[in-house]
């Protein structure tokens, strides 16, 4: 009884708090002047902290003190993303208020979860009738409410197959609509659940199928989860199901992890069949890992043949496959005509500056190999248009052309509101709070909406004014996908970062180049691996480097003191630079992947310092996709930060050719 009363009391407090927020918001709109520009950073941080802890009354008190409508809006918006319990009626009010805000669909998802299966409240079902459901659960609940037509039955079936649900929701769906789900539908759903590692739902679904298919799916689960008894489980799978796509995929992956060479044979044989892959993207990981392994073993034709059967259709994987096929054909098989086909295919399907420059650069190299110099120059010209990218810069040097970069001058732009201006005021407050979590959600949500060029300029200008180069870079990366001219906004000058002593180890432009790629200039960055701060230093590396500097090691300071972080990171890079005989490229690779990996790659792929291999091909030989991308991005960052942003403070600029040719 006590617990029930306590729960009711807690819920009533939450409802009261939300009503108070909404009431305060309405009165502020009527009577308050906007005061967002004067809000203190410490107040913003405290408000976010209070909202996360469900202390709404205290958060409102601070908002009232600041007399800001936007702050009240922001409290409401952040509250949606906390794990605090919100009643359905309040969620509906919130959706009505924030329908045009970033991530508003999350409110709909929460509402759809809370609507009862047998709710007597017609208004709840009217809401999802009028506001198209965004979740599978919402679609099934709406179909359940309107369950009269064949269409509604099909909606239930389609959403059931390709989604997972809570145990209680599954129980209701199964008890009411089991007659809709024949064996084929049950198999399809279990197939989906295992591919997507939804184990709890998969185990429940296993109880609904016959023994043959049960044995198949049990074997797949054991393989995927690396459980004991894999061989015995596979033996129980009947012969007519042994070539199931999901089972073959899991067997290939399991054998690769076990370092068994038979994984390649199984993969090649399955891809060689004329069968469509249902989960092409999942297969891509296995294909590319095995291809790179074959390249490492210098089995170039075998690598080419395996990759030729990739069967990828999404643009990202298809472009990666076409590029690598072209590169293998050109550099390892001496088949420029074959390479030409692949690079042409690549050029037709890409539109992002980095990829367009890459495709045209390699087309140019291929045409040179075929003695088509005039055509090669045309492709170099096309690549050089994108001269803030790695291959664009290389193309520019190849034709001895140095074009200017048309940076967008945000200072000359005006903020003009084409949509709810409160959204932009709230974005400014988040930027000022010097936090990343909610800012990132806000940015992602904005770019998922129908966003105009002026909206993008507003966003970027706000981040520039609030001295948040990290958020500016994040937003620019999104903006480039909508309009490639924003590529030239990707290199902000970080006025809020002090370099000072670090320049005695490496130059300022290189420091900025590394920081931009490591943390995007966010001082509070912590990676999943534990790397910390602007230069993303691992604590163990920082400890050793601090000792070499004769300074005290302080783990907390790596994160809290940007200058300390940069000093240690720069010193560590300079040590790599010495180890690799003043090779910038090898040092960059070592900074990302560790010097031990670089030493290993030099033995496997050749040493560009001894001209055993060109630096360009050595970089493309790196087996880690993250490191390949990292090296290219840091090099382009380095050139741009020298060439444009730091031009007045550098006596001589290193071109990309100098960096590449001298390592």
Task: Set out the residue ranges of the language-model regions.
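Bacterial N-terminal signal peptides that target proteins for export
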Residues: 3-16
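N-terminal leader/linker segments that initiate helical-solenoid repeat arrays
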Residues: 30-78, 85, 405-424, 432
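Solenoid-like repeat scaffolds
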Residues: 35-36, 60-69, 81-84, 93-101, ...
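TPR repeat positional signature
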Residues: 43, 76, 108, 139, ...
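Structural register within alpha-helical repeat arrays
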Residues: 46, 74-79, 111, 142, ...
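Residue at a conserved register position within TPR or TPR-like alpha-solenoid repeats
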Residues: 50, 115, 146, 193, ...
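Structural motif corresponding to the intra-repeat A-B loop/turn of tetratricopeptide repeats
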Residues: 53, 118, 149, 196, ...
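Catalytic glycan-binding domains that act on GlcNAc-containing polysaccharides
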Residues: 70-73, 77-79, 89-97, 235, ...
């Amino acid at each position: 009884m006590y617990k029930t009363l306590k729960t009711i009391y807690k819920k009533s407090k939450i409802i009261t708090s939300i009503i108070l927020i909404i009431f305060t918001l309405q009165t502020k709109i009527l009577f308050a002047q906007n005061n967002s520009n004067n809000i203190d950073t410490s107040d913003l941080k405290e408000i976010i902290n209070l909202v996360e802890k469900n202390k709404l009354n205290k958060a409102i008190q601070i908002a009232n003190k600041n007399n800001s409508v936007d702050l009240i809006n922001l409290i409401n918006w952040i509250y949606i993303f906390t794990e605090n319990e919100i009643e359905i009626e309040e969620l509906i009010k919130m959706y009505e208020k924030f329908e045009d805000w970033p991530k508003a669909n999350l409110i709909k998802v929460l509402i759809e979860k809370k609507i009862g299966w047998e709710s007597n409240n017609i208004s709840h079902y009217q809401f999802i009738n009028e506001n198209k459901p965004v979740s599978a659960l919402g679609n099934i609940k709406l179909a359940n409410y309107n369950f009269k037509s064949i269409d509604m039955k099909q909606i239930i079936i389609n959403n059931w197959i390709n989604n997972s649900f809570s145990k209680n929701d599954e129980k209701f769906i199964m008890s009411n609509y089991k007659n809709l789900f024949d064996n084929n539908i049950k198999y399809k759903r279990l197939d989906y659940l295992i591919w997507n590692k939804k184990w709890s739902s998969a185990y429940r679904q296993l109880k609904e199928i016959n023994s043959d298919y049960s044995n198949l799916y049990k074997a797949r689960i054991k393989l995927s989860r690396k459980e004991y008894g894999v061989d015995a489980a596979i033996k129980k799978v009947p012969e007519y199901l042994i070539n199931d796509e999901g089972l073959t995929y899991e067997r290939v992956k399991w054998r690769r992890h076990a370092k068994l060479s038979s994984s390649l044979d199984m993969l090649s044989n399955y891809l060689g069949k004329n069968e469509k892959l249902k989960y092409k993207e999942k297969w891509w990981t296995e294909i590319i890992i095995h291809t790179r392994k074959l390249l490492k073993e210098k089995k170039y034709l075998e690598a080419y043949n395996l990759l030729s059967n990739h069967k990828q259709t999404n643009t990202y994987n298809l472009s990666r496959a076409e590029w690598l096929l072209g590169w293998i054909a050109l550099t390892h098989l001496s088949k420029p005509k074959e390479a030409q086909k692949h690079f042409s295919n690549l050029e037709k399907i890409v539109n992002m500056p980095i990829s367009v420059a890459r495709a045209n650069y390699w087309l140019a190299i291929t045409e040179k190999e075929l003695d088509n110099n005039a055509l090669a120059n045309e492709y170099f010209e096309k690549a050089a248009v994108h001269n803030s990218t790695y291959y664009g810069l290389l193309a520019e040097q190849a034709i001895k052309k140095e074009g200017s970069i048309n940076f967008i001058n945000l200072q000359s732009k005006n903020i003009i509101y084409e949509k709810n201006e409160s959204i932009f005021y709230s974005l400014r407050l988040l930027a000022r709070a010097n936090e990343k979590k909610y800012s990132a959600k806000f940015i992602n949500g904005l770019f998922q909406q129908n966003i105009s060029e002026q909206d993008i300029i507003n966003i970027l200008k706000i981040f520039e004014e609030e001295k948040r180069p990290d958020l500016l870079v994040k937003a620019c990366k999104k903006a480039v996908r909508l309009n490639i001219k924003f590529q030239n906004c990707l290199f902000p000058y970080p006025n809020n970062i002090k370099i000072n002593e670090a320049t005695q180890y490496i130059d300022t432009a290189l420091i900025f180049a590394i920081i931009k790629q490591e943390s995007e200039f966010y001082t509070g960055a912590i990676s999943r691996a534990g790397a910390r701060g602007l230069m993303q230093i691992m604590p163990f590396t920082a400890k050793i480097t601090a000792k070499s500097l004769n300074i005290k090691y302080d783990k907390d300071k790596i994160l809290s003191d940007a200058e300390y972080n940069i000093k240690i990171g720069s010193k560590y890079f300079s040590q790599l630079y010495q180890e690799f005989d003043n090779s910038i490229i090898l040092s960059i690779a070592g900074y990302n992947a560790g010097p031990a990996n670089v030493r290993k790659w030099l033995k496997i792929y050749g040493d560009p310092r001894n001209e055993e291999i060109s630096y360009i091909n050595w970089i493309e030989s790196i087996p880690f996709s993250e490191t390949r991308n990292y090296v290219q991005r840091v090099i382009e960052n380095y050139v741009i930060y020298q060439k444009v942003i730091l031009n007045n403070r550098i006596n001589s600029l290193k071109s990309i050719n100098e960096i590449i040719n001298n390592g």
